[in-house]
Each structure stands twice: as C-alpha cells, then as structure tokens.
Amino acid sequence: MVAASHRSPDRPGDPEGLEPGTGRGRRLGIDVGTVRIGVASSDPDGILATPLETVRRERSGKHLRRLATLVGETEAVEVIVGLPRTLADRIGSSAQDAIDLADELAARVAPIPVRLADERLTTVSAQRSLREAGVRAKNQRAVIDQAAAVAILQAWLDQRRTLAGGRADG
C-alpha cells in the first residue's frame, strides 16, 4: 500500500480541502469495483457530473495507467474516489480497496488532489435510476459503474457548493 500522505483531506467542507487552484476546473469521480471502475467528469464550473468511461480492472495495474491518463486528458484539478463505508460507518474490504486505489492513483497524479467521498448506496441508487429510465437489467451492466461514479461526484459537488456558499455568507 502506498502512503496515504499523497491524498488530500476527504471531506468537501474541509478548509484545507479548498486549496487555491482547485476552485474552478473539471473533477473526476471514480466508483471502484472489483471488476470495473466507473469514471465521471464534471463541467469546469463544478455544477454537473456526467458519465465518462468504464475502465476494466486489470491485475497488471493497467487500470491505474488509464485513470491517470484520464486525469491528464480531462485536465482534472481534483479526483473524488467513492468510499463505500458500511451502513454502520465502518471500513470493510471494499472501502479498503477504494483507499488503496486512491493512494496508488494519488501517487501517479500528484500534485492533483485525490479525495475520498462517502458513497454508501450509490450503486443501489444508480440501479434504481437506470431501472426507472427504462434500461433493461442486462444492459445496466455496461453503464452502472459510470452511473455510480456520476452519483458520487454529483453528491460531492453539491455538498462542496453548499458548504462554500455557507462560508461566503458567514
């Protein structure tokens, strides 16, 4: 495991998490799965998250190279990795996997900050949204990871905007 010191504070409201240079610009949201990794991107103003790509997880680490490439290609100023805590707010094996991936990616894309964001139930929420949109179950597999990444990133953007607005008013 790579030292966690490469990662930045994990909460969008952290004063330390709003460093100069990370105000405007695209953010990437990442949903870490055991087989596939969903990636979403925001607009430069940080208002709307949209699906970007599904990256196949490889033992060789090729997925990390692809994620780092996407950070560069999109000119991302920040990367948000979903942290799937348990409902009891504990870190299980899936969360540890996300932490490890975030640490490895942070080492590759430094000085771009890589943060963790709570993502409990985002895949369930993404599945429900796809089902309600009429996407058949067998077709969901191709886009579910991207939809979960969109949910993670959009929630983070919304929370960050709310907290930044509260600071500006206070």
Swiss-Prot record:
GO terms for cellular component: cytosol. InterPro entries: RNaseH-like_sf, YqgF, YqgF/RNaseH-like_dom, YqgF/RNaseH-like_dom_sf. One of its GO terms (molecular function) is nuclease activity. Keywords: Cytoplasm, Hydrolase, Nuclease, Ribosome biogenesis. It is an enzyme of class 3 (hydrolase). It is found in: Cytoplasm. Signal peptide: none annotated. CDD domains: YqgF. Its main location: cytoplasm. It comes from the Bacteria. It holds the Pfam family RuvX. Residues 1-29 are annotated as: Disordered. Its EC number is 3.1.-.-. The keyword Amino-acid biosynthesis does not apply. GO terms for biological process: rRNA 5'-end processing. PANTHER family: POLYNUCLEOTIDYL TRANSFERASE, RIBONUCLEASE H-LIKE SUPERFAMILY PROTEIN. Belongs to the YqgF nuclease family. Could be a nuclease involved in processing of the 5'-end of pre-16S rRNA. This is Putative pre-16S rRNA nuclease. It comes from Mycobacterium marinum (strain ATCC BAA-535 / M). The lineage of its organism: Bacteria, Bacillati, Actinomycetota, Actinomycetes, Mycobacteriales.
